[in-house]
Amino acid sequence: MCDMLQSVREELMNLEANGDENKDSSDEATFENLPVEIILTICSYLDPYFLRNTLSKVCRRFADILADDHLWKHWVHSKIKGCFPALLDLKLLDEDQLNWEDVCIDMDVERRKWSDVKESMRHIVVKDVHFASVDTVLLVNNGELCISGGRDRGMALWNVPDITPQDQSDNAPTLSEAKPKHIKHDAHAGWVWDLAPDCIDSATKVFSASWDNTVKVWDLETGFECIETFKCGMSALSVVSTDNLVMAGLYSKKILSFDLRVGPNPINAYKPHRGPVLALHTYKGMVASVSEDKTLAVWDKVAGKLLTNDVKIPTDKAYPVCISWSPTALYVGDSKGSLHLMHPEDQIYIKSHEIWPEPPIIKPSSKITSCYQSPGNLIVCSDRGEIKFFYNCYPPQEYATVKASTFDVTQMRYLNGVMVIGRCDSALEFWIPNEKY
């Protein structure tokens, strides 16, 4: 009996000793074995881009923690004062199609960049290439190529990495002696008014709309040569494209469709407005148009019919200028500084935001020349040289403002961190990330 008790006592002592060893090893505090609440608190102070691309790859536990979509959604809502997305009755929310991780990272990356633009970007002005107002600009191929056109009837193709500032140390806007890769002084017989690519991420062709009643096709792979001229019969004020299908908005209130494989004549025409078609925007299989008659219309390219038209844009003396359509919002910018929110799925008017308040009658209004949406951000540019950056929530929440070195801006484009504007004084103005140098 005593032997049995002694055996049990020894076994208990061994278990106690092993427990003490395990306790000692577990008491070693490492980041990996911290409670999840503490890990999340630490993560809330870190760069979301670092969390996704570095910390989540350290170990399986971190990957599992950061894979929670609700976590990224919480971080998005902690950044804003309103609601995101701007509308809460979207089908993509019901179907869980919104990538909250992408939204959170996009918000953080863009805010850091544009809130400290002097440290993060090179601000460069290019002059003496065009000799009249540069009315339209375009960025393609991840911001590596820029195309410009203007009232000198010419077009230029720029290799963005070649646009280097004269003074690398000066944070003020600097001049560049960069020359375009190709230039066509006689691209059109009238003003070049709008540009569009066949595919913005891997463009091989660019389409130019002009007051000479044509839309021309330019091949980026064969020396910027014109390979087709579409006959519009009236001044072309806007153009969009998807692959081989090209659509042009005309001064005559019509919208024409062309097929690059068919030839120079239109394959379809429709008339959704009672005034000149001022802007077009393509989204999925649809094309939105706005007109001087202050209405919005949407065309279904697949069905070949109007989905909706005569959607009133509530402006007094203003007229619509630009369109931006994303999965979460459809915006129309007008000539008096207001941004009008439309439902991106139903295309009905929701609300107007006064981005630039109407000034006294003796001062000019700020026209919204361009509007750009990314997963979490909104960029709005005025013709008075002010560019505002917002979280794309409701209402839009401004976090940065950048001023151009001019008061006469014609158009703004943004792609992959590169921003360019056209100017009335025949110059182009670039903001290029420092890491590209």
Segment roles from a protein language model:
Residues 131-138, 189-197, 229-242, 275-281, ...:
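Canonical WD40 repeat/beta-propeller blade segments in eukaryotic WD-repeat proteins
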Residues 228-309, 313, 318-323, 327-329:
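Solenoidal tandem-repeat scaffolds enriched in leucines and small polar residues
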Residues 155-159, 209, 215-219, 255-259, ...:
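WD40-repeat beta-propellers
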Residues 2-44, 49-138, 142-144, 149-181:
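Intrinsically disordered, low-complexity acidic/Ser/Thr/Pro-rich linker and tail segments
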Residues 149-152, 209-212, 249-252, 290-293, ...:
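Conserved strand-to-loop turn within each blade of WD40 beta-propeller repeats
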Residues 52, 143-147, 202-207, 225-228, ...:
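Structural hallmark of WD40 beta-propellers
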Residues 125-129, 167-177, 181-187, 226-231, ...:
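Short C-terminal beta-strands that terminate individual repeats in beta-propeller domains
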